[in-house]
């Protein structure tokens, strides 16, 4: 499987042969859904909280005597059925994270890469280095390349000037290759990999 390599100026820089076991799979939506759900659940704050009967500021005195009034039997007015009472089975602070096997996560990443390749939404670029960190100049380059909504994966480290110029652009994400993940790949229209990122991914899944 071969991809043409482009440059930030829109020129050609040869081609690269990639492993079909990484970029040529038949995408499985179930794997992608499981991985995205795992990522979003892990980042969910889980800080929602309501007060239980033991926490609200209300007297615990019995409302009226047990017998003789003709009314239903009640204890304290902090019970959930009364106005101002506690919430029954309300949310408490907890972690929403759940486990997903490492092999499934790795397979989902390969399927996400394959999905972009199959949709012709994967671009390999020679390098992402800039002499200055000017956002306007980079925006013009992206406009010429058609990268209005893209995830750009650099090498082990992202060029400082490139990262500074790209961070002010909406719908453009820049990550080092170690940070590549299924959710960020799928939420952008285009995936841009540097030559160094392709080599790192090939080595990772060897």
Curated annotation (Swiss-Prot):
Family matches, as Pfam families: Ribosomal_L4
GO cellular component: ribonucleoprotein complex; ribosome
UniProt GO molecular function: rRNA binding; structural constituent of ribosome
InterPro entries cross-referenced by the UniProt entry: Ribosomal_uL4 (IPR002136), Ribosomal_uL4-like (IPR013005), Ribosomal_uL4_dom_sf (IPR023574)
Keyword Ribonucleoprotein among UniProt keywords: yes
Assembly mode: Part of the 50S ribosomal subunit.
Family: Belongs to the universal ribosomal protein uL4 family.
Name recorded for this polypeptide: Large ribosomal subunit protein uL4
């Amino acid at each position: 499987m071969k991809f043409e390599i482009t440059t930030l100026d829109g020129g050609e820089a040869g081609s690269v042969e990639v492993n079909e076991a990484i970029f040529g799979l038949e995408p499985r939506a179930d794997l992608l859904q499981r991985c995205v759900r795992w990522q979003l659940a892990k980042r969910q704050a889980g800080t929602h909280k309501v007060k239980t009967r033991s926490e609200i500021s209300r007297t615990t005195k019995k409302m009226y005597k047990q017998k003789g009034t003709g009314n239903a039997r009640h204890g304290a007015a902090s019970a959930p059925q009364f106005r101002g009472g506690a919430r029954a089975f309300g949310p408490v602070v907890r972690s929403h994270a759940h486990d997903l096997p490492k092999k499934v996560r790795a397979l989902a990443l390969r399927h996400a890469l394959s999905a972009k390749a199959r949709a012709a939404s994967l671009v390999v670029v020679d390098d992402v280095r800039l002499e200055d960190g000017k956002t306007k100049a980079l925006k013009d380059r992206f406009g010429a390349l058609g990268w209005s909504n893209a995830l750009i994966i650099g090498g082990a480290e992202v060029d400082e000037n490139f990262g500074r110029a790209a961070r002010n652009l909406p719908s453009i994400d820049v990550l080092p290759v170690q940070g590549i993940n299924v959710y960020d790949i799928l939420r952008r229209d285009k995936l841009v990999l540097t030559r160094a990122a392709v080599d790192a991914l090939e080595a990772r899944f060897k």
